[in-house]
From Swiss-Prot:
This is U-scoloptoxin(05)-Er1a. The keyword Disulfide bond applies. Keywords: Disulfide bond, Secreted, Signal, Toxin. Belongs to the scoloptoxin-05 family. The keyword Secreted applies.
Length: 125
């Protein structure tokens, strides 16, 4: 019988993940007439193109006031930092799990989390 550590290793690394990432994809601006379908009330997550492997949240502030948010798929990771130009600030966060761009918190990848758990179990036994 396989040990729990070996079973987790096989589960994480040998079973392929879903081939397509799903992210929230929408835009909301404070002064727009559009309904709030991206800030507090999110639409359903939708499939990204195959080369898009990150979900991104892009928040914009002006004079420290929240003015817009954009959620989208990306082929490049964002560093989770904010850049400031004058009174404007732009903060971009990325993650690698389906529908993970629902907030500004960065969610660790599934492989990373399971790897840490598997290592802990192997070292513990």
């Amino acid at each position: 019988m396989l040990s729990l550590g070996v079973s987790i290793f096989l589960l994480v690394f040998l079973i392929p993940e879903n081939s397509g990432l799903e992210c929230y994809q929408c835009t909301w601006m404070k002064n727009s007439q559009s309904p709030d379908n991206c800030y507090k009330n999110l639409p359903n997550a939708t499939a990204c193109a195959k080369d898009m492997i990150y979900c991104v949240t892009d928040e914009r502030y002006e004079d420290d006031e929240f003015i817009s948010i954009r959620r989208f798929c990306s082929s490049m990771p964002m560093d989770g930092r904010c850049t400031e130009v004058g009174k404007a600030k732009d903060c971009k966060y990325s993650c690698e799990v389906d529908a993970c761009n629902f907030s500004t918190s960065i969610e660790p990848s599934k492989v990373f989390v399971f790897s840490i758990l598997a290592m802990g179990l192997v070292l513990h036994t």
